[in-house]
Amino acid sequence: MEHLLSLLVRSVFIENMALAFFLGMCSFLAMSKKINAAIGLGIAVIVVQTVTVPANNLLLTYLLKEDALAWAGVTGVDLTFLSFISFIGVIAAIVQIMEMVMDKYMPALYNALGVFLPLITVNCVIMGGSLFMVERDYHFAESVVYGFGSGAGWAIAIVLLAGILEKMKYSDIPEGLRGLGITFITVGLMSLGFMSFGGISL
């Protein structure tokens, strides 16, 4: 239990997907202009990441790894070369289901997210979560915690950035820095702030 709690804190703060690995930057920068849209996308990423990382873990463990099909009486088969395409398929299916649910029950949020909801399918933060899970050889419980933590870390980062940028609307920013210029500087300073969590011993 202590190990899982440590993994959760590490994935949210120390190894933050947006501010430590700079993954998912396209939607991170585009959707951080309004705090409501940022919260909506953040929640969507948390849900997709929490479901896809453990789903891909099960797929890898019981279908793709070497001798993973031993439960079906098939041995000596290694399908790990299909990992990328399989992970993308799982992610696409889950995002599609989520898109249909949001369209039906949360139309305002669905319209606010616009093109960025289907873009979660190809958002590198989602694929990155599954690939880190494979690289670090997480078991199922770890993959659930890591999926939630990495999604939550990304969501916290985008909501913080949206809050800062909304406050900056009332600031006298030099003309040359308006728009993406000040956004990049802000993200860099946020990243430096999150680096301080690296000194925590867990």
Curated annotation (Swiss-Prot):
GO terms, molecular function: oxidoreductase activity, acting on NAD(P)H, quinone or similar compound as acceptor
Question: Transmembrane segments in this chain: where?
Answer: 11-31, 35-55, 81-101, 114-134, 144-164, 180-200
Q: Give the superkingdom in one word.
A: Bacteria
Tell me its EC number(s), please: 7.2.1.1
Q: Does the keyword Transport apply?
A: yes
Cellular compartments annotated: Cell inner membrane
Question: Which key words are in the record?
Answer: Cell inner membrane, Cell membrane, Ion transport, Membrane, NAD, Sodium, Sodium transport, Translocase, Transmembrane, Transmembrane helix, Transport, Ubiquinone
Reply yes or no: does the keyword Cell inner membrane apply.
yes
What's a BP term from Gene Ontology annotated to this protein? respiratory electron transport chain
Coiled coil start-end = none
- What InterPro entries does the database record attribute to this sequence? NqrDE/RnfAE (IPR003667), NqrDE/RnfAE_oxidrdctase (IPR050133), NqrE (IPR010967)
Which family does the entry's similarity section mention?
Belongs to the NqrDE/RnfAE family.
This molecule's function is given as: NQR complex catalyzes the reduction of ubiquinone-1 to ubiquinol by two successive reactions, coupled with the transport of Na(+) ions from the cytoplasm to the periplasm. NqrA to NqrE are probably involved in the second step, the conversion of ubisemiquinone to ubiquinol.
Record note on quaternary structure: Composed of six subunits; NqrA, NqrB, NqrC, NqrD, NqrE and NqrF.
Q: Which HAMAP family match?
A: NqrE
Q: What is this protein called?
A: Na(+)-translocating NADH-quinone reductase subunit E
Q: What is the native source organism of this protein?
A: Cellvibrio japonicus (strain Ueda107)
Identify the gene encoding this protein.
nqrE
